[in-house]
C-alpha cells in the first residue's frame, strides 16, 4: 500500500484531538498543524505520537496548504479535529491505495451532525469534500 499522512489542523482542540488521532492511527504519519493552541492540544497530540508543526493561523486553506508539503508521505488525508475517519472509510482508503490508482484525488462523503443529530435534509445529506489526494499534485 502506498504511504499516507493524515493532516489534522488545530487550534484549541483538546476536546477533540485524541479521538481524531485515534481514528487515523492506521496512517503512516499523523501530522498536527497547530495554530499555537493555548490549551493542551499540542501536549495531547505529541503524547499520542503525532508530529506537531506550528504557525500562526491565517485562514483554513492557507493553513492546510502550508501543512501539505510537510507531509512525509505521497498521499494526504485531511481531517478536521472535530471529524472522525470511520472504519469503513479507512478500509476504502486502504483498498484504493493498495490497488494503485490513476486518480490524483478522491471525494469523501461526509455525515454531518447538528446538536447530536444526523442531518438528513437541506442539502447537507449529500455533502462531499476532496480530502484524499496526492501531496505533490493537489492543494
PLM region descriptions:
Residues 62-68, 74-79, 86-139:
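Catalytic-site signature of metal-activated, phosphate-bearing donor transferases
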Amino acid at each position: 500500500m502506498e504511504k499516507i499522512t493524515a493532516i489534522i489542523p488545530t487550534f484549541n482542540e483538546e476536546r477533540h484531538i485524541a479521538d481524531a488521532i485515534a481514528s487515523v492511527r492506521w496512517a503512516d504519519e499523523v501530522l498536527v498543524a497547530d495554530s499555537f493552541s493555548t490549551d493542551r492540544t499540542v501536549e495531547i497530540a505529541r503524547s499520542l505520537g503525532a508530529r506537531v508543526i506550528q504557525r500562526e493561523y491565517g485562514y483554513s486553506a492557507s493553513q492546510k496548504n502550508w501543512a501539505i508539503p510537510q507531509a512525509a508521505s505521497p498521499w494526504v488525508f485531511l481531517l478536521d479535529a472535530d471529524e472522525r475517519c470511520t472504519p469503513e472509510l479507512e478500509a476504502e482508503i486502504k483498498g484504493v491505495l493498495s490497488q494503485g490508482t490513476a486518480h490524483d484525488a478522491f471525494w469523501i462523503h461526509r455525515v454531518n451532525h447538528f446538536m447530536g443529530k444526523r442531518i438528513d435534509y437541506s442539502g447537507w445529506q449529500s455533502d462531499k469534500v476532496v480530502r484524499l489526494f496526492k501531496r505533490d499534485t493537489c492543494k
